């Protein structure tokens, strides 16, 4: 290599280094975009503007200094700020809003422990496929990794839990980052997204400038370099911050079945004599209205088993809704349509499916679509697409065709026999206190037609799932496949805000109540009255039922018959203690609770219950 070539390469490398450094330091951007040093505006306003343009009505939070600008700006734009007593509750409330409103639920929490407190709730949203945006505060951009207050590697925590994670580095990035996150949350298989906002991207220039002002910097050349670097960093942070940007929602991508796939399924369904449909929560996702799905199912005339958020889709007493004997029905079925239903533990990993049956599986998520298909079952047709729109297209293509009526009738007859047997168990006297099945039947009979039921617990809630009947679509909220305890307070809060005229019930076990009983304070402060039905048997019964006979000890399963109703009173609600001596007045107490709830009081019914064998053999691991 001659000297001229060597010099040319060296100059090229040097020039490339200068250009790269200029880009990283924002020098090139600053040449063309102004830094408005006198502007009182702050990054929280940009966040609020994007949220408003996307139809966000609520932001759930537990306040912290890192995120205060976002909360203040949202309030000024008419977005309601709802503060809870635990960060997990804020995320659960956002999850409920996402499920019931068809939009993205939003929670904002402070840095460090504020964010770590949300991990379980975010994982629950991921597994329940709920589109929500988690906003987290963070240490200032220059202080991350340097031991700042509440500074941890938050991105590593949330990358496994979220579809999209971003850390905003300049104020100008806020709008495009939030727009992108909201679109990703709703696209494909919905799920949570996370954006980290360093504190210096949220406060006004003059506030951040004070923090960046050089203090005790070295003298001489090094001091000048540090001062220049800090000044440039600040300028780049705010360069182009307040330029006009598009705030509108980005397109949302939803996968759909192809015409050929629908046609193949039409042929299979038209030949079936004993088809069944298993609907999961995915069947209720936007954009297909739940009422349209109901009409499609009624047109098909195929018996349906409803799970998760699809409970209530067919109303209270549909002849097509089969609630009992699912295993037997699947054994006899010659065609099974899994509409958003997954072959996990809830279907014994696919082992309950008849190998001779034709199986149509529809799911937005490929991994869920084919889960355990390598071992226990094989789909005849597997469609990675939206279950709701698929059912509509299938119904239209099969117009005029209905399932043979004797098949759903026979399943309904078996259903009625099992329901009668279950009712007989409710009439049995327990050794002490009230029969929980009887209590649940009484409540179910008195539920308002617009009621929303929130399920949070193990044994008592498991019984409620058999007995209590949601009156309509999107009227049942449970955690989903993760089986998380502690969703009750947040789910009920979100549900009541979405549907303020509806009667919202939380069905609690006495164990699960302990997670969110403090949210009675939230219900009172934010005027979101709900009714909590607590099955109090002083035990973690879901675990105790198997632990005692298998291992011979009730260790860690025992609780006390605690006065939870007094706690509700202390938080500004109204509590009732209900024991066996109150059995004859139970209906009157329930009606009184409903009346007080309508008048604005959150109510807790602390019902002392005894033991039954109704759920022997139920899954706890």
UniProtKB/Swiss-Prot annotation:
- Coiled coil ranges: none
What residues does Mg(2+) bind to? 510, 536
User: Which cofactors, if any, are listed as required?
Assistant: Mg(2+); thiamine diphosphate
Give the note describing cofactor binding and stoichiometry.
Binds 1 Mg(2+) ion per subunit. Binds 1 thiamine pyrophosphate per subunit.
What keywords are assigned to this protein?
Answer: Endoplasmic reticulum, Fatty acid metabolism, Lipid metabolism, Lyase, Magnesium, Membrane, Metal-binding, Thiamine pyrophosphate, Transmembrane, Transmembrane helix
Q: What top-level class of enzyme does the UniProt entry assign?
A: lyase
Q: Which sequence ranges are marked TM in the entry?
A: 7-29
Q: Molecular function (GO) terms listed?
A: acetolactate synthase activity; flavin adenine dinucleotide binding; lyase activity; magnesium ion binding; thiamine pyrophosphate binding
Does the keyword S-adenosyl-L-methionine feature in the UniProt annotation? Answer: no
Disulfide bridge map: none
- Does the record carry Lipid metabolism as a key word? yes
A Gene Ontology biological process annotation?
L-valine biosynthetic process
Q: What Pfam families does this protein's entry cite?
A: TPP_enzyme_C (PF02775), TPP_enzyme_M (PF00205), TPP_enzyme_N (PF02776)
Its subcellular locations are: Endoplasmic reticulum membrane
One cellular component term (GO) for this entry is:
acetolactate synthase complex
The entry marks the following residues as binding thiamine diphosphate, namely 87
The ranges of region (Thiamine pyrophosphate binding) come to 459-539
State the family named in the UniProt similarity comment for this chain.
Belongs to the TPP enzyme family.
Described purpose of this protein according to its UniProt entry: Endoplasmic reticulum 2-OH acyl-CoA lyase involved in the cleavage (C1 removal) reaction in the fatty acid alpha-oxydation in a thiamine pyrophosphate (TPP)-dependent manner.
Q: What is the name of this protein?
A: 2-hydroxyacyl-CoA lyase 2
Recorded source organism is Danio rerio (Zebrafish)
């Amino acid at each position: 290599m001659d000297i001229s070539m060597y010099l040319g390469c060296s100059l090229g490398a040097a020039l490339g280094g200068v250009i790269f450094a200029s880009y990283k330091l924002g020098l090139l951007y600053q040449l063309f975009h102004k830094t408005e040093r006198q502007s009182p505006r702050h990054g929280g306003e940009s966040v609020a503007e994007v949220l408003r343009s996307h139809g966000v009505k609520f932001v759930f939070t537990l306040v912290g200094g890192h995120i205060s600008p976002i909360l203040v700006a949202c309030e000024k734009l008419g977005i309601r700020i709802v503060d809870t007593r635990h960060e997990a509750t804020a995320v659960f409330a956002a999850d409920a809003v996402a499920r019931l409103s068809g939009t993205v639920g939003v929670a904002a929490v402070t840095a460090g422990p504020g964010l770590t407190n949300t991990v379980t709730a975010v994982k629950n949203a991921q597994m329940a496929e709920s589109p929500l945006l988690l906003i987290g505060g963070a240490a200032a951009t220059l202080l991350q990794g340097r031991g700042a207050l509440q500074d941890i590697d938050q991105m590593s925590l949330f990358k496994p839990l979220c579809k999209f994670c971003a850390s905003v580095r300049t104020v100008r990035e806020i709008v495009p980052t939030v727009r992108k996150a909201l679109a990703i949350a709703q696209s494909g298989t919905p799920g949570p997204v996370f954006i980290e906002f360093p504190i210096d991207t949220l406060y006004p220039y003059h506030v951040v400038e004070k923090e960046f002002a050089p203090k005790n910097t070295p003298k001489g050349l090094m001091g000048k370099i540090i001062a220049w670097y800090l000044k440039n960093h600040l300028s780049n942070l705010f360069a182009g911050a307040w330029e006009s940007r598009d705030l509108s929602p980005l397109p949302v991508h939803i996968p759909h079945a192809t015409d050929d796939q629908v046609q193949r399924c039409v042929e299979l369904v038209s030949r079936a004599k004993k088809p069944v449909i298993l609907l999961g929560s995915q069947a209720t996702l936007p954009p297909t209205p739940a009422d349209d799905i109901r009409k499609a199912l009624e047109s098909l005339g195929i018996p349906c088993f409803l799970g998760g958020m699809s409970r209530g889709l067919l109303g209270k007493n549909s002849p097509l809704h089969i609630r009992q004997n699912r295993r037997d029905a699947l054994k006899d079925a010659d065609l099974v349509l899994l509409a958003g239903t997954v072959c996990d533990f809830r279907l014994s990993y696919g082992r309950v499916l008849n190998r001779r049956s034709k199986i149509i599986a529809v799911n937005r998520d490929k991994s869920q679509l084919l889960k355990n298909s390598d071992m226990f079952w094989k789909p005849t047709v597997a469609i990675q697409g939206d279950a709701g729109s698929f059912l509509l297209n299938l119904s239209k293509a099969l117009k005029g065709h209905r399932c043979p009526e004797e098949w759903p009738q026979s399943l309904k007859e078996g259903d009625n026999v099992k329901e009668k047997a279950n009712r007989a168990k409710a009439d049995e006297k327990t050794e002490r206190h009230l029969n929980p099945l009887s209590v649940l039947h009484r409540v179910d009979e008195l539920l308002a037609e617009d009621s929303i039921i929130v399920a949070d617990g193990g044994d008592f809630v498991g019984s409620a799932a058999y007995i209590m009947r949601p009156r309509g679509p999107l009227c049942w909220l449970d955690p989903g496949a993760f089986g998380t305890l502690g969703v009750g307070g947040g789910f009920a809060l979100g549900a009541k805000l979405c549907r303020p005229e509806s009667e919202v019930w939380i069905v609690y076990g006495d164990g699960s109540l302990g997670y969110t009983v403090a949210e009675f304070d939230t219900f009172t402060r934010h005027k979101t009255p709900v009714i909590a039905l607590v099955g109090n048997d002083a035990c973690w019964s879901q675990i105790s039922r198997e632990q005692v006979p298998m291992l011979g000890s009730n260790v860690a399963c025992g609780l006390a018959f605690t006065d939870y109703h007094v706690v509700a009173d202390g938080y500004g609600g109204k509590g009732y203690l209900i024991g066996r001596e109150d059995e004859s007045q139970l209906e009157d107490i329930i009606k009184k609770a409903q009346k007080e709830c309508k008048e604005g009081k959150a109510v807790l019914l602390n019902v002392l219950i005894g033991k039954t064998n109704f759920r022997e053999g139920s899954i706890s691991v």
